[in-house]
Amino acid sequence: MGTGTLSSLLLLLLLVTIGDADMKGHFDPAKCRYALGMQDRTIPDSDISVSSSWSDSTAARHSRLESSDGDGAWCPAGPVFPKEEEYLQVDLRRLHLVALVGTQGRHAGGLGKEFSRSYRLRYSRDGRRWMDWKDRWGQEVISGNEDPGGVVLKDLGPPMVARLVRFYPRADRVMSVCLRVELYGCLWRDGLLSYTAPVGQTMQLSEVMVHLNDSTYDGYTAGGLQYGGLGQLADGVVGLDDFRQSQELRVWPGYDYVGWSNQSFPTGYVEMEFEFDRLRTFQTMQVHCNNMHTLGARLPGGVECRFKRGPAMAWEGEPVRHALGGSLGDPRARAISVPLGGHVGRFLQCRFLFAGPWLLFSEISFISDVVNDSSDTFPPAPWWPPGPPPTNFSSLELEPRGQQPVAKAEGSPTAILIGCLVAIILLLLLIIALMLWRLHWRRLLSKAERRVLEEELTVHLSVPGDTILINNRPGPREPPPYQEPRPRGTPPHSAPCVPNGSALLLSNPAYRLLLATYARPPRGPGPPTPAWAKPTNTQACSGDYMEPEKPGAPLLPPPPQNSVPHYAEADIVTLQGVTGGNTYAVPALPPGAVGDGPPRVDFPRSRLRFKEKLGEGQFGEVHLCEVEDPQDLVSSDFPISVHKGHPLLVAVKILRPDATKNARNDFLKEVKIMSRLKDPNIIRLLGVCVQDDPLCMITDYMENGDLNQFLSARQLENKATQGLSGDTESDQGPTISYPMLLHVGAQIASGMRYLATLNFVHRDLATRNCLVGENFTIKIADFGMSRNLYAGDYYRVQGRAVLPIRWMAWECILMGKFTTASDVWAFGVTLWEVLMLCRSQPFGQLTDEQVIENAGEFFRDQGRQVYLSRPPACPQTLYELMLRCWSREPEQRPPFAQLHRFLADDALNTV
């Protein structure tokens, strides 16, 4: 072997060895994924700030991933839709490469439901200039959480070099969101703040256009120059040997490289400048280059670098020169190492000499050490208080104080004092205006013919867990399984005090939609207060919940016939069921009324075979199951009927084993209540499984599913005189007759008549909560709220709960009063659904906010309220009955006994 050949082999081996060694100098973002300190509290509370918070219990310090402090997360004070200006800021104190973020909603041990389905990120390296993070395709929005408890990790491609990071939660409608976060990455030891370079160019090849631009650069672009930012040359991604290929998926040819043609640079070099965070001693610069010389890409012919210590200083001395020569041998991409000789500086200017048609770089990194000279150290970035970062920095003076530099604005103390006084005066004027407004409201109420007691006006968008006022007093309450974050100013673990109903009426955000003019109370003389009614509870603001009294006499002694209103209101308790909100509001029972424990009708769990999940909620799920060998269970213990050859379908409500103690107690109470219901048009409790977890209750389920889906799949027969013969087939599919629709409505009225005799209030009567069995048998159920299919029928109130406002009487929406009369209103809407064959949602032309405003029109009673239109198949007489169901005055609505009698006997005569 000749000497020349041996020398060539040694040179090639040296180049490969140097290239491999130099590759180790480029950081690997895959190894830069350490938690940066939110969860383990390495990041102190003082370095976490927010634009606003709902209360102290949802302040910035509670935003740590997997933390359950306070109310369980950071929750902004206002809605994030549509402006998306609320943010959570984390100060990392030093530059870090952030490669991954984790988010979580507010779970709070099962009490919270708020989370953010998507969010944006902004970041800053100096506290002054903020950049929007974008992925490699220019998208800013990051998908977030689908539930409040799960942690969702998102890779950031490209990663961002930042000291301060802001999370901006997003929503597609007005709703509450809460957030917990963690950042993952590592310390940015390069210290590179920005680089300045010519804009990358496009290479025209015969088969493809190769775009060699810096697509992730986060600085400015002007005059063919990119400056003030970082991009692909500092993202840790090293290009492949063939620059037309890429490490990333779904990107264009040349994505990994930034390149320039020598034809565009008559000087024969590309000049770049690099700015660092502080004064450094530079040992080596490593540049990863492409050398696919068959397509024109060559290594640089040489590199010249100069240094300076400050932005206003001149470049120091002679440049450091390093000749490379541009290899025509090995076409593989490689990292070249440029020795910098230990020069000191904070700014570098490097010129890369062309040795061929193109220069292509994918990564540039530096090996350097920080100079421990405080006089030359670049000061750390200022910390900005919550709010938009200032845009004019000419008047800012940086004063380090301890470990936290602050931005101090030069200003006159007199101006600050005047501003404070103006703010105080405006606040006092606002308080006076609110007091006058409240006083005027009280006068209006006192002048009305029918007095509405303040304690009766618990006027807010009522949720299923709210107090329901019966006989002007709240029913006994259980601690709700879902709790919204405590109001601002309320100390932890204290119950919010409700001063009076008028204040709630005036302060309710939803009610602001309604007060275009002053409302007046309902007209007509009010009924005298029954002598047996207890006085209004004056301790409603105590920290404890009321317990039901233990009467020795019957719960509700019958009053004189002429002393009660048309609809009596009973003492009730509300239960939070498996799915987070049971629909029934039921009478408060004296001890021993239904036994001390759940009925001992233990259903054999092994006989249940899962078919599908009907719905789910906060504390459990509702499953559709089939009972195996049901004929063996036919006995007095299990009220089931089995038809030979037909499977027995049941609905199984399952309580999660980790449910709270309150949820378990409510579950057992619901079992007791359900065991009292025995009516052919109400679903029955067939049995329970309470010996071990998970607790289950088994109820009827009908083979034809819910009434909404059943009717929407059918057409109305043309012959209105068709008898009760059921379904028939036509060319358009199954049909249903008008008499059968009346039969359906009569069965619903019959079931509700039975509930009314027990003083049960359903609160969510709709076709989605009615089940259809054999021969058009209708049974009223209560788990429609848990089904995702009907999520659009419910309105979320400030992230707290969901309400079927399109079916609710105006007094339910505005005053939280649920009575049998409000169920009559919902029955009228349900009957409208039946006659429309469930083709349309009630008030489908109105938004949710307009429906609430329409409830306000009923309250004001100025003739501007909107009613549901008459269905095409509905006779005028029947429509007039429906309008009576929607009477403004609850006592003017027909009772269910009258509704059932009309639909069962008289309705056909009106056709």
UniProtKB/Swiss-Prot annotation:
Catalytic activity: L-tyrosyl-[protein] + ATP = O-phospho-L-tyrosyl-[protein] + ADP + H(+)
Protein location: Cell membrane
SUPFAM superfamilies, alphabetized: Galactose-binding domain-like, Protein kinase-like (PK-like)
Pfam families from the UniProt entry: DDR1-2_DS-like, F5_F8_type_C, PK_Tyr_Ser-Thr
EC numbers for this chain: 2.7.10.1
Disulfides per UniProt: C32-C186, C75-C178, C305-C350
Region of interest: DS-like domain: 193-369
Annotated positions binding Ca(2+) 2: Q232, D235, V237, S362, E363
Disruption phenotype: Mice are born at the expected Mendelian rate, but female mice are dwarfs and most of them are unable to bear offspring, due to defects in blastocyte implantation in the uterus. About one fifth can bear offspring, but for these the mammary gland fails to undergo proper differentiation during pregnancy, with hyperproliferation and abnormal branching of the mammary ducts, leading to a lactation defect. In addition, mice exhibit hearing loss, due to alterations of the inner ear. Mice display poor calcification of the fibula.
GO biological process: axon development; branching involved in mammary gland duct morphogenesis; cell population proliferation; collagen-activated tyrosine kinase receptor signaling pathway; ear development; embryo implantation; lactation; mammary gland alveolus development
Subunit structure of this chain's protein: Homodimer. Interacts (via PPxY motif) with WWC1 (via WW domains) in a collagen-regulated manner. Forms a tripartite complex with WWC1 and PRKCZ, but predominantly in the absence of collagen. Interacts (tyrosine phosphorylated) with SHC1. Interacts with SRC. Interacts with MYH9. Interacts with CDH1. Interacts with PTPN11. Interacts with NCK2.
Family: Belongs to the protein kinase superfamily. Tyr protein kinase family. Insulin receptor subfamily.
Protein's name according to its UniProt entry: Epithelial discoidin domain-containing receptor 1
Gene source species: Mus musculus (Mouse)
